[in-house]
Amino acid sequence: MADISPGAFAPCVKARRPALRSPPLGTRKRKRPSRPLSSESEVESDTALESEVESETASDSTESGDQDEAPRIGGRRAPRRLGGRFFLDMSAESTTGTETDASVSDDPDDTSDWSYDDIPPRPKRARVNLRLTSSPDRRDGVIFPKMGRVRSTRETQPRAPTPSAPSPNAMLRRSVRQAQRRSSARWTPDLGYMRQCINQLFRVLRVARDPHGSANRLRHLIRDCYLMGYCRARLAPRTWCRLLQVSGGTWGMHLRNTIREVEARFDATAEPVCKLPCLETRRYGPECDLSNLEIHLSATSDDEISDATDLEAAGSDHTLASQSDTEDAPSPVTLETPEPRGSLAVRLEDEFGEFDWTPQEGSQPWLSAVVADTSSVERPGPSDSGAGRAAEDRKCLDGCRKMRFSTACPYPCSDTFLRP
């Protein structure tokens, strides 16, 4: 039998079974199942991808099954037997990535083999699910998890509508309650509170520029207020507001109401003094009071007024000391002029005689904090010797100055009185 060359039957084979070019890898339009928006487990996603790959593999094997049924060997088809001879079908070789790229036309206008829709899709980014898998909000369709803030029951409950303006009845009831509250708080003398306030004022004046003169002013002021009330000499409510520099404010209104309420409870025994001159020197408020000393020294400064006050206090102390020294000496002529029973001196003497001057703390009336230490018998006088006075002055620096009374100081040292 003559040898038959494979080239003689090659055209017949090609005409009988034309070679089909396999499409470029990745150009086939594939329909992938759309991934759900909600989060699923990784097992479900992997299973879907595996089923998709298997379906594509099965479709490729079905299409190529009719063309070549022989198994592949090393990526190439097995040789076919034709007319006692074997030959390789080079047209049916599997394509590689390089051949696929070369087979694709570089011309962008050439759309004979594939369309613009057949472009392989880009790899999608990994989806970040912000919803917790085990969160109870999953059934409510909440994308973000709950915040850590827990709402109180007060916020969840519906609020009642607030009235835009108070009713006239409510305003009337409120005014009645305020009037009752003011009437119940009636003024009563509080001696303990007065003593604490005076003690605090003395402490503040210790660090002043002129502590001695400022303390004397405070003592004289409280003494005059007491004697003024004892003699039933009173000021009008508006004059008190001017004196305390609170006229025209809320404090002034409360002060006037308190004074009028107390005056209505007691009988008035004297006409109110309404004339009160204003302070013409440096002032610390809208209106101030002038004492008898400052009326004639209205053009002087505060330092000159303080010096004049100290000189006046020193003169009174010197007079009292000289009187105490001459009490022991017998007087050649003794003329006693008794005071009338209703005079101011007799009334003050009777009241002072009823006071308990024991040194126990808390047993003294508030007047003792005012009268005590107003003068001292240890101050140098014209008849005192210099050496003796120097020793006594050094002794005075160790404690409070002696009071004008026979007993010791009722208050602790440096708590109430100023050191010299």
UniProtKB/Swiss-Prot annotation:
It is found in: Host nucleus. It comes from Human herpesvirus 1 (strain 17) (HHV-1). This is Transcriptional regulator ICP22. InterPro entries: IE68 (IPR003403). Pfam families: Herpes_IE68. Residues 1-172, 315-341, 373-393 are annotated as: Disordered. Its main location: host cell. Residues 41-68, 104-116 have a biased composition (Acidic residues).
